[in-house]
Curated annotation (Swiss-Prot):
Entry similarity comment: Belongs to the FAM20 family.
Name of the molecule in the record: Pseudokinase FAM20A
Native species: Homo sapiens (Human)
Result when mutating residue 403 to N: In AI1G; impaired folding of the protein; abolishes ability to activate FAM20C protein kinase activity
Pathological condition linked to this protein in its record: Amelogenesis imperfecta 1G: A disorder characterized by dental anomalies, gingival overgrowth, and nephrocalcinosis. Dental anomalies include hypoplastic amelogenesis imperfecta, intrapulpal calcifications, delay of tooth eruption, hypodontia/oligodontia, pericoronal radiolucencies and unerupted teeth.
One cellular component (GO) term of this entry: endoplasmic reticulum
Domain of life: Eukaryota
Gene: FAM20A
Subunit: Interacts with FAM20C; probably forming a heterotetramer of 2 subunits of FAM20A and 2 subunits of FAM20C.
Keyword set includes Signal: yes
Length: 541
């Protein structure tokens, strides 16, 4: 009996010790955290940025007339040499605060004809899409005998991709003052994926060629459609080339690599130029096993995954884009960086017109197009519909200026929303063949400008502003790209090439003015009436 009592005592002591340890190490720290105000770790500016962004968003919501630029997700981590603005630590913020970037970009009240989508119709369409996805996902789980505790997807009206679609109007893909773009970039960067698949054009071409006849490394086209937990979609282009590598001089433009960092940088440049014609694009490090292989229902995509001799998980696309494993992309061992470009509204909701570029290049090894041999080619273009409308031609010239800055020779088509008619803006899609060679400036890309000798006054004013030291293009691009998770997105030679190419554009315009006169070359737009005191540079300087 005394032995049993001792055992009970030892048991009680042991239980008491365990209870005391639980109180001391688990419950008491939680009570302390509740009673003590939260302290922010030294050197962590996250809380300040979050409250600042919240205040900016609240200000924009309470006063629709107040223009608040929400382009910068974070403050730059470093201050580059020569990158400080007089009286300000940010050239990018100073640029967006300039009067040129604050002129009214649209009438105070947009009519239904000025918005791309009718909101109620779009929401009904998206609800049907979500319901259909839930049904198909349920059927797939039943067929594969899979169990899942995840609830069915719900369409959230406040989802950033929904608000992005509803915000597209005849002036651009998004407004300067819209806080939606920053939220969309953040969501694409962090939201988990729920499905992965080939793009529609790749599906249409699967098996449509004989892989033995492929004579080029066609894997450069590999891209996937990723869907996120909020039902948003993005085009994923994986890293194919290191940032410090240049396109070989013997490569034709139509077999060049598609670079994920070029897509990211093109979005930032388009925003800095105030075009707003490139869909929001962000960099992300993707786990190819968990975020692609394990969520895809496409058996063909599942079949092209393999483990390399270095134990890295790789995948490749089927013919005609890729036929061999040496053209695969590989994680390290699972992680792979790439670009994510937000999808535009479905063609069922917002039909788009794909138009051949009048300055399209010859996609043969030796041929040349008429514009390459005829310096008066633009005179012919001006007589042809729809380019006898100067606005369409001016938009093509804007596109050529953009392509020259990024070094993109592969602009064979452009797209437009049919709703906005002939005067609608051109969408600058597929920019992954830009930023290939920083050491070479392809002057032929500027042929629309040099042959037509026309430019929008608004475009010229922005270019001249970016040529000034306080707003130098390379500096604001460097600062803007620091916002991306994959920073540095561009190497320093590519950034400096932007300044060099900008000067080439301005010299081309100056030569046109000398030859034809300022009134003939510079086409006045609304910017002249809306911002007469916006600090324009001398047009002939």
């Amino acid at each position: 009996m005394p032995g049993l009592r001792r055992d009970r005592l030892l048991t009680l002591l042991l239980l008491g010790a365990l209870l005391s340890a639980d109180l001391y190490f688990h419950l008491w720290p939680q009570v302390q955290r509740q009673l003590r105000p939260r302290e922010r770790p030294r050197g962590c500016p996250c809380t300040g940025r979050a409250s600042s962004l919240a205040r900016d968003s609240a200000a924009a919501a309470s006063d629709p007339g107040t223009i608040v630029h929400n382009f910068s997700r974070t403050e730059p981590r470093t201050e580059p040499a020569g990158g400080s603005h007089s009286g300000s630590s940010s050239k990018l913020q100073a640029l967006f605060a300039h009067p040129l970037y604050n002129v009214p970009e649209e009438p105070p009240l947009l009519g239904a004809e000025d918005s791309l989508l009718a909101s109620q119709e779009a929401l009904r369409y998206y609800r049907r899409k979500v319901a259909r996805w839930n049904r198909r996902h349920k059927m797939y789980r039943e067929q594969m005998n899979l169990t899942s505790l995840d609830p069915p997807l719900q369409l959230r009206l406040e989802a950033s991709w929904v608000q992005f679609h509803l915000g597209i109007n005849r002036h651009g893909l998004y407004s300067r003052s819209s806080p939606v773009v920053s939220k969309l970039l953040q969501d694409m960067r962090h939201f988990p994926t729920i499905s992965a698949d080939y793009s529609q054009d790749e599906k249409a071409l699967l098996g449509a060629c004989d892989c033995t006849q492929i004579v080029k490394p066609s894997g450069v086209h590999l891209k996937l459609v990723l869907r996120f937990s909020d039902f948003g979609k993005a085009m994923f282009k994986p890293m194919r080339q290191q940032r410090d590598e240049e396109t070989p001089v013997d490569f034709f433009y139509f077999i060049d690599f598609q670079r994920h960092n070029a897509e990211i940088a093109a979005f930032h440049l388009d925003r800095i130029l105030d075009f707003r014609r490139v869909p929001p694009t962000v960099g992300r490090i993707v786990n190819v096993t968990k975020e692609i292989l394990e969520v895809t229902k496409n058996e063909i995509l599942q079949s092209v995954f393999f483990v390399s001799p270095a134990s890295n998980v790789c995948f490749f696309a089927k013919c005609p884009y890729m036929c061999k494993t040496e053209y695969a992309v590989c994680g390290n061992p699972h992680l792979l960086e790439g670009s994510l470009s937000a999808f535009l509204p479905s063609l069922n909701l917002a039909p788009r017109l794909s138009v051949p570029n009048p300055w399209i290049r010859s996609y043969t090894l030796a041929g040349k197009e008429e514009w390459e041999v005829n310096p008066l080619y633009c005179d012919t273009v001006k007589q042809i519909y729809p380019y006898n409308n100067s606005q369409r031609l001016l938009n093509v010239i804007d596109m050529a200026i953009f392509d020259f800055l990024i070094g993109n020779m592969d602009r064979h088509h452009y797209e437009m929303f049919t709703k906005f008619g002939d005067d609608g803006f051109l969408i600058h899609l597929d920019n992954a063949r830009g930023f290939g060679r920083h050491s070479h400036d392809e002057i032929s890309i500027l042929s629309p400008l040099s042959q037509c000798c026309m430019i929008k006054k608004k475009t010229l004013l922005h270019l001249q502003l970016l040529a000034q030291a306080d707003y130098r293009l390379s500096d604001v691009m460097r600062e803007s790209l620091l916002e991306d998770q994959l920073s540095p997105v561009l190497t320093e030679p590519h950034l400096l090439a932007l300044d060099r190419r900008l000067q080439t554009i301005l010299r081309t315009v100056e030569g046109c003015i000398v030859a034809h006169g300022q009134q003939s070359v510079i086409v006045d737009g609304p910017v002249e009436q809306l911002a007469p005191d916006s600090g324009q540079a001398n047009l002939t300087s």
